[in-house]
């Protein structure tokens, strides 16, 4: 099998690190709409990321943009996530350009 052209340029001294990233779109519903002036958030995440990783990415975003707003943190930690109208677990593996919805708890009276 023939080596790709780029392989001949790599030596022990030159280590090429390729990070495979994919895009995930988080659709915002209910109280999570306060996270942005848009209807969604977009993040670049590593391949093979899970909902748990996305939840942490959202928490990092909130910390950076809203100084760790405690109410927003509670919303993220207690929210469900869904894909294709199905509730998904924190272990669910995300695919590239997948749309995920965050579904905050709903209170009423």
What is each model feature region?
Residues 2-6, 12-108:
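Ubiquitin-like/PB1-type beta-grasp interaction modules and other compact soluble beta-rich domains
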């Amino acid at each position: 099998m023939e080596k790709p052209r780029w392989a001949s340029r790599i030596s022990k001294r030159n280590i090429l690190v390729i990070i495979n990233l994919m895009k995930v779109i988080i659709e915002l519903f209910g109280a999570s709409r306060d996270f942005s002036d848009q209807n969604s958030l977009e993040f670049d995440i590593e391949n093979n990321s899970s909902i748990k990783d996305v939840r942490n990415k959202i928490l990092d975003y909130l910390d950076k943009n809203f100084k760790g707003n405690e109410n927003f943190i509670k919303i993220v930690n207690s929210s469900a996530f869904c894909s294709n109208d199905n509730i998904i677990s924190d272990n669910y593996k995300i695919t590239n350009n997948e749309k995920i919805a965050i579904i905050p708890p709903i209170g009423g009276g």
